[in-house]
Amino acid sequence: MLEQVRIQKMVNGGYGLAHLSNGKVVLVEGAYPGEEVLIKTYREKRDFSFGKVVSLLKESEDRIKPPCRYFGRCGGCHWMDVKYETQLRYKKEVLIDLFERSNLKVEVEDVEPSDLVFHYRTKMEFHFQGRKLGLKKRNSDFVIDIKDCEVAPEGTGEILNTVKEAVQVLNVPVYNWETRKGVLKHLVIRYAFSTDQFMVIFVTKTESFPWGRDLVRAVLKRFPKIHSIIHVMNSKDSVVLRGPYKTLYGEGVIVEEFDWERFQIPPTAFFQSNYSITSKLIDHVYREQALQGNEVVLDLYAGIGTFSVRTSFSAARVISVESSRVAVKAGKANANINSRKNIEYVEQDVLDFLKNYSGRADRIILDPPRSGAGPEVMKEIARLSPERIVYVSCDPSTLVRDLKVLVENGYSIVRVKPFDMFPQTYHVETAVTLVKGDR
């Protein structure tokens, strides 16, 4: 069904919201507030539909020509065709809308902009498919073959094309996502901005990878400054960087440095995707704890210690809880590198840890995955009754869900500060500060 609609506002997920002639809500991808578009609805839900733009009838003044030749086909970026300042405004408006619909009365601050709006990513995951090497279409497993990427670090395109050529020359069997046969699945590129270190990661289904040595030679011949080359063995299709790994070349880690600390980042550990925003976020989380020097701090979903290290300079003790063995090992190493003796790492599921923890928790930091912490974790946090909580989230919808539990258990939201971790996309990082009792 074709219908002309006017986009009223942006909503979570990067969609433009409009109403059909029958009053039903329709979410339109690739359309912005004030635009009039001819759409075709393609998926029906009980309360709303999804629509695709067939024709743009009235264009927003905020539209620009995207610099990427793959934009609109590749699913990596969503808002590259609107001005950067407009992207920031949309992200703030989406957050305000979500908080209002959840009956959480807060003031959302302006989104902290990224120093780099292109070539800012610290990690890119590319996928092999037949003779293609690239990024997937949005909501699809179809891979768009690309030669460069506007958000990947400078130099990524050259590495990408060198690997693709070498894979074809060496006749490396590429993994087939339908038959689940073949070997080579992904190419991951990690980059440390402060030290100019590249890590190239080959992800395979199998442990055996006899082509690895020749691929290393091909990459190093053109890029002798590559810091590390890694082979990750991952038989699962759901997550890219998971499973045992071995170092084919180099040290096996890259190092990122900030004002007060430096971090070793291993191949499969999580680390934030934007260097400049991560630096600002570390500062923010540290300040928002208002530490006096005698506090015990729980850092939940601690990763490699991104927030733990800075916090440990002003807290009596930091207990860093993380379920990933690789991240825990790196976190302990990072505590040593930064001469922090008051950080204790616990390798355990966060909920299991909280259920059995009865010690002090004067402050709690949490930075859960996109799925959020969940109501059970939030109830356990409330039970421990910390004076201040700083919740860092990469998904606004799971954030407001979790915050409601804390508010219902006697906490007040005193600050909502968004950070633009992902320019050119609808994603937004948000740090929320809560205090026990009334603000």
UniProtKB/Swiss-Prot annotation:
The cross-references to InterPro entries, in alphabetical order and at most eight, read: MeTrfase_TrmA_AS (IPR030390), MeTrfase_TrmA_CS (IPR030391), NA-bd_OB-fold (IPR012340), SAM-dependent_MTases_sf (IPR029063), TRAM_dom (IPR002792), U5_MeTrfase_fam (IPR010280)
Under which name does UniProt file this protein?
Uncharacterized RNA methyltransferase TM_1094
Listed under GO biological process in this entry are:
rRNA base methylation
Q: Which residues form the active site?
A: 394
A Pfam family cross-referenced in the UniProt record is: tRNA_U5-meth_tr
Concerning Gene3D superfamilies, the annotation shows: 2.40.50.1070, Nucleic acid-binding proteins, Vaccinia Virus protein VP39
What's the top EC group for this one?
A: transferase
Q: Where is the TRAM domain?
A: 1-55
Q: Please name the PANTHER family in this protein's record.
A: RNA M5U METHYLTRANSFERASE (PTHR11061), TRNA (URACIL(54)-C(5))-METHYLTRANSFERASE (PTHR11061:SF30)
